[in-house]
């Protein structure tokens, strides 16, 4: 399973959240997730980075992995560009290091790593999984929430240069297809692979 939205390493790192993570670690399947707005990035940074599935991930125990930004994973013969991160619209109302982390926005190094990985793959993947979306997806839709930020503009640049089949993003907590190639996902489960590629 791939999750394109914040998932496990949440704000407080409480015992209840640890219990949920422990439950996920015991599932009989591999779970990969992208980071979003409300991860506790200080806790997440404590997990070691390793090469797996063709890209960089952090193993959280069991079969749970955080996918590092800009990784191109290879799963069941398909390539996935994965890029987490977003900008909280309410960050001024949050407390740094408690329920908001500046690391929610990608660093220069993460943008550069993404471009280098795409270059190494000839700017071609099967699927794109991001937490946020290019501004070109958001403009003129009900998903638009203010001014474009650096991440939106970076994803615009990727969108214009990249060859891909479908792009999925999860930041906006809605299930809506924007086109045959782009979709906002919140609760929907989207099957991937050969038999589902024509959907």
State the predicted function of each range.
Residues 2-9:
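Short, small-residue-biased leader/transition segments that mark boundaries at the very start
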Residues 6, 124-126, 165:
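Conserved acidic residues
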Residues 55-56, 62, 71, 75-146:
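Active-site-proximal loop/helix segment associated with metal-binding centers of metalloenzymes
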Residues 19-22, 30-34, 45, 49-62, ...:
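Conserved beta-sheet core of the metallophosphoesterase superfamily
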Residues 1, 127-131, 168:
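Structural motif
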Residues 10-96:
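A basic- and aromatic-enriched beta-loop-alpha substructure that forms the phosphate/nucleotide-
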């Amino acid at each position: 399973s791939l999750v394109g939205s914040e998932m496990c390493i949440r704000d407080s790192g409480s015992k209840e959240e640890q219990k949920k993570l422990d439950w996920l670690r015991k599932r009989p399947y591999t779970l990969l997730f992208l980071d979003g707005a409300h991860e506790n990035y200080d806790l997440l940074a404590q997990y070691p980075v390793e090469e797996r599935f063709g890209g960089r991930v952090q193993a959280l125990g069991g079969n749970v992995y955080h996918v590092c930004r800009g990784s191109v994973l290879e799963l069941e013969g398909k390539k996935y560009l994965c890029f987490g991160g977003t900008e909280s619209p309410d960050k001024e109302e949050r407390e740094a290091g408690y329920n908001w982390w500046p690391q929610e926005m990608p660093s220069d190094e993460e943008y550069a790593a993404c471009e280098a990985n795409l270059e190494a793959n000839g700017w071609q993947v099967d699927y794109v999984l991001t937490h946020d979306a290019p501004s070109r997806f958001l403009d003129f839709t009900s998903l638009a929430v203010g001014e474009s930020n650096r991440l939106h503009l970076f994803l615009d640049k990727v969108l214009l240069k990249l060859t891909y089949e479908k792009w999925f993003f999860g930041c906006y907590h809605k299930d809506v297809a924007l086109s045959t190639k782009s979709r906002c996902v919140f609760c929907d489960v989207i099957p991937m692979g050969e038999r589902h590629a024509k959907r």
